[in-house]
């Protein structure tokens, strides 16, 4: 305000000097002084002049001023009056000056503010760049941490899957001497490859887990390889002396056929153990050759193995004590052999011999050996037989025969009890000393060749039909009665194709069954059988049921 007032005062003074120079000088005379002592009243519209005049009139008596002073005051008053009038009529220069000053100051302030703002912006940009870079670095490290953690989680998941597969594979093999070696070895190798595929930056925990799991897998693969070597050596040792029709079978003996043996024991092949009897009492009588021998045979336990090929047909049978032999000139089997599978189809007879052998002979010049697929239950007993692979061999003398249409499937023994799954008409079981036991079975087959019913001579049916009689033993030209020991077993329940069945246990017969009657001029015989059961060391005879006569 002081500067503004000073500026205004200077401006008024300059205007007053200019006006004083332009106006003529008044004469300083007494008349002028008189006139000045009695001034005319100011106009009503001029308030300023009126105030000045009033002030002068009030102080006229008190102060006496000279003429010059009064003239100067009067000139000042007049100049002020003129200035006011000019301000009313003309655009005010004062306002313009003030506005210009204000505008200039505003410009100065803006320029200073712009400089300060530019400096602040530069400083702010510098600080924001550092903050952004720091945030960028933090985000980068955090994202890399998330990536590494996700990789670790994925590797942990893969390790868990590999370990679960390994434990499942190990549990399926543990406690078993025989298993598909190639399948297990290939699966273990695949697990090792999957374990090796876990690479890159690995967490220490994952690294230690991977190391331990790899060590376990390598040990398991070595164990499987050792089992394969042991089994292969056992098979070669057991089959070194085996001959079929004067030739060594495939898969035994020669190095050129080792690959075929391994191919047979491939992924789909199986080795099935079959346990034999510990003790067995054999009651024998006259066979067709007329030899009658009675006695006891004590047989040590023997473990046998049956190897099934891809088509589930029996391709190898071997044990751990004796070799398998088969001669084209003699179809009989040694006393220590036992027949696993006996089959016959369309007038051709077949046999696959192992231990405690079974001999089936016919009247043809050739026999057809049919290998049946054998399925065993948990106890090592036969539960299913199927398949029809043929093998032509030459036959020898036909002392004993099985009629056309018969099919002898399986004979097995367990713990002194005779088990027979299914037979066609009869099977000759030969032990040591030429003793024979005849077992007669009636078998019904379905369309697929599977057995769905098997039964024998039970107390409910004491007489066998003529067809079974002709099958069981007709001998032309021989009128003598022969004491044949016929064992009859009843199978009350035979399951279907996909079910395993358990056969009823029957006790052995210790004495001969009497065979009496001969019919007709043709020499056919009707055999009436009597069962002799051995219970608690005493003989109990069950007579046949009486025949019902139709009216």
Curated annotation (Swiss-Prot):
The modification Phosphoserine is found at residue 332. GO terms for cellular component: chloroplast; plasma membrane. Its main location: plastid. Residues 1-19 have a biased composition (Basic residues). Co-chaperone that regulates diverse cellular pathways, such as programmed cell death and stress responses. IQ domain mediates interaction with calmodulin. This is BAG family molecular chaperone regulator 8, chloroplastic. It comes from Arabidopsis thaliana (Mouse-ear cress). The gene is BAG1.
């Amino acid at each position: 305000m002081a500067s503004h007032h000073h500026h205004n005062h200077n401006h008024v003074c300059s205007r007053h000097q200019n006006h004083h120079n332009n106006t003529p000088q008044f004469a300083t005379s007494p008349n002028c002084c008189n006139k000045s002592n009695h001034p005319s009243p100011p106009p009503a519209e001029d308030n300023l002049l009126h105030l000045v005049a009033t002030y002068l009139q009030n102080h006229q008596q008190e102060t006496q001023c000279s003429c010059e002073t009064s003239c100067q005051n009067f000139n000042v008053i007049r100049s002020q009056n003129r200035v006011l009038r000019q301000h009313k009529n003309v655009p005010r220069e004062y306002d313009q000056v003030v506005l210009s000053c204000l505008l200039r100051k505003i410009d100065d302030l803006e320029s200073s503010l712009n400089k300060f703002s530019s400096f602040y912006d530069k400083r702010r940009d510098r600080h924001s760049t550092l903050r952004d870079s720091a945030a960028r670095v933090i985000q980068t490290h955090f994202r890399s941490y998330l990536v590494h953690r996700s990789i670790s989680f994925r590797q942990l998941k893969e390790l868990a899957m590999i370990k679960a597969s390994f434990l499942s594979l190990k549990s399926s093999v543990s406690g078993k001497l025989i298993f598909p070696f190639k399948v297990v070895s290939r699966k273990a190798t695949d697990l090792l490859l999957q374990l090796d595929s876990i690479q890159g930056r690995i967490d220490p925990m994952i690294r230690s887990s991977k190391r331990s799991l790899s060590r376990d897998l390598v040990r398991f693969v070595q164990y499987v390889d050792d089992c394969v070597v042991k089994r292969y050596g056992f098979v070669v040792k057991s089959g070194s002396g085996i001959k079929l029709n004067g030739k060594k079978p495939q898969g035994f003996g020669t190095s050129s056929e080792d690959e075929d043996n391994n191919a047979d024991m491939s992924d789909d092949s199986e080795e099935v153990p079959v346990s034999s009897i510990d003790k067995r009492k054999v009651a024998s009588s006259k066979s067709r050759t007329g030899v009658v021998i009675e006695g006891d045979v004590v047989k040590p336990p023997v473990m046998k193995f049956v190897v099934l090929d891809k088509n589930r047909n029996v391709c190898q049978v071997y044990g751990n004590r004796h070799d398998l032999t088969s001669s084209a000139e003699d179809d009989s089997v040694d006393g220590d052999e036992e027949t696993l599978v006996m089959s016959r189809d369309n007038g051709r007879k077949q046999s696959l011999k192992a231990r405690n052998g079974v001999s089936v002979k016919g009247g043809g010049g050739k026999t057809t050996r049919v290998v049946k697929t054998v399925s065993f239950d948990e106890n090592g007993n036969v539960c299913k037989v199927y398949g029809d692979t043929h093998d032509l061999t030459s036959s020898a003398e036909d002392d004993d025969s099985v009629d056309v249409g018969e099919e002898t499937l399986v004979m097995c023994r367990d713990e002194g009890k005779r088990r027979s799954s299914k037979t066609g008409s009869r099977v000759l079981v030969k032990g040591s000393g030429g003793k024979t036991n005849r077992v007669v079975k009636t078998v019904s087959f379905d369309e697929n060749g599977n057995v769905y019913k098997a039964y024998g001579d039970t107390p409910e049916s004491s007489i066998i039909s003529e067809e079974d009689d002709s099958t069981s033993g007709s001998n032309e030209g021989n009128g003598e009665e022969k004491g044949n020991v016929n064992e009859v077993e009843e199978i009350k329940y035979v399951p279907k194709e996909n079910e395993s069945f358990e056969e009823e246990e029957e006790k052995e017969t210790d004495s001969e069954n009497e065979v009496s009657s001969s019919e007709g001029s043709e020499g056919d015989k009707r055999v009436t059988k009597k069962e002799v059961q051995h219970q608690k060391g005493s003989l109990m005879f069950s007579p046949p049921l009486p025949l019902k006569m139709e009216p």
